[in-house]
Amino acid sequence: MASEIFGIAAVFWVLIPVGLLGGVLLLKLQGD
């Protein structure tokens, strides 16, 4: 069970920064 929680946490640690950077890039592209 602990390994599953750690895996889910690792996925969120990766997806959250990627999602934020992607959103910023989309806003910049739309701004131009």
Curated annotation (Swiss-Prot):
GO terms for biological process: photosynthesis. The chain crosses the membrane at residues 5-25. Component of the cytochrome b6-f complex, which mediates electron transfer between photosystem II (PSII) and photosystem I (PSI), cyclic electron flow around PSI, and state transitions. Keywords: Electron transport, Membrane, Photosynthesis, Thylakoid, Transmembrane, Transmembrane helix, Transport. The lineage of its organism: Bacteria, Bacillati, Cyanobacteriota, Cyanophyceae, Synechococcales. Pfam families: PetM (PF08041). GO terms for molecular function: electron transfer activity. It is a single-pass membrane protein. InterPro entries: PetM_cyt_b6/f_cplx_su7 (IPR012595). The keyword Transmembrane applies. The 4 large subunits of the cytochrome b6-f complex are cytochrome b6, subunit IV (17 kDa polypeptide, PetD), cytochrome f and the Rieske protein, while the 4 small subunits are PetG, PetL, PetM and PetN. The complex functions as a dimer. The gene is petM. HAMAP family: Cytb6_f_PetM (MF_00396). It is found in: Cellular thylakoid membrane. This is Cytochrome b6-f complex subunit 7.
